[in-house]
Amino acid sequence: RTARASYDDLANILYTSGTTGEPKGVMLHHSCYLEQFHTHDERLTTMTDKDVSMNFLPLTHVFEKAWSYLCIHKGVQICINLRPADIQTTIKEIRPTLMCSVPRFWEKVYAGVQEKISETTGLKKALMLDAIKVGRIHNLDYLRQGKTPPVMNQLKYKFYEKTIYSLLKKTIGIE
């Protein structure tokens, strides 16, 4: 049976919720997922079978389904969050090393961080703001692009990893 499998075979059908009209089914073929595996194999080079991922979205959501397939492809342990309303507690229980979610979730995390920063002053506030800037450059401008960050950025990132980032990760539960 495996010998007859094709990239063009149907992998699954995902349906829209119908909130803006009639629900629609989208036929997704294995080639869609395999192409994503190839791209992520090149870009997410640190993802290994030692990682733990936590599903936050329903598996009917294409983003979560594709992420779950990628985790299976990489041998990552997948934990399913059964209590969406208790996401912060669940994250602290699971302590995922990887997680994908829609931007709104991370916007809420970011807003919480910004609120904490606004309550601080002086050197502590300056260090927190610089840590965000360094992290953004390190991860978005370099690692996400498959590039090596400059040495100075790497040094600053390591410093913040041992101070601010580790504290933040521990607070969120993603250490």
Describe the predicted segments one by one.
Residues 34-52, 59-166, 171:
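Conserved AMP-binding/adenylation subdomain of ANL enzymes
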Residues 173-175:
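Short, intrinsically disordered, charge-balanced linker/junction segments flanking boundaries
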